[in-house]
Amino acid sequence: MNSTETSTPTAPAAPKRADARRNYELILTAARKAFAEGGESTSLEEIARQAGVGIGTLYRHFPSRQVLLETLYVNEVHEVCRSASQRDDDPWKALSVWCQGLIGYLTTKRALAQELLKYLDEDAALFQECRRTVYAAGEPLLECAQEAGVVRPDVEFSDVLQMLAGISRMPANDPDQVEHVVRIALDGLRYRPQA
């Protein structure tokens, strides 16, 4: 049931009333946790129960499972991308810390993305907008590190994303191994003058 027309690249606006906003956030928090733990087997009724709200309240905020999934996905992408704006004075550290955060996001949100692909094609507007958001956040970090002479000049941001996407597919049951591979991969980006 793939459809690109129903997808919007931005999440529904959070409600303005304090109680409605609280319920909205409770639902998102419960859904984030439920999808991380149970994946596709998670029912909306279970999410409402975990959030401490009625199913009608959940549907008022999120009229379908797809809308809830899209909102979670967009919010998570924006959260990881916002961290890029909290730059460190050290361009290498700024890039590497952000890449490690993106790996953490990609690794833990794999199930969420797979669930969304039941509703959307890979080239849906939602995914395209999220890719643009990731590029807008990460590309300046790479360029800054290259200008500082700490990252190889032949590296494109698309190379970095491909590298991180590959690492994110590693089994997540050994975080130390994932961290080790991330360090090796990031070390491969470093500029080393020829002797």
Regions found by a protein language model. Give the residues of each.
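Short secondary-structure transition hinges
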Residues: 103-140, 165-173
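Short, hydrophobic secondary-structure boundary micro-motifs
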Residues: 43, 81, 111-117, 150, ...
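Short hydrophobic/aromatic patch on the recognition helix
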Residues: 52-62
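Alpha-helical DNA-contacting segments of helix-turn-helix folds
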Residues: 62, 69-76
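Basic, helix-initiating cap at the start of DNA-binding domains
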Residues: 1-41, 45-50, 67
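Hydrophobic alpha-helical connector segments
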Residues: 71, 82-108, 122, 126
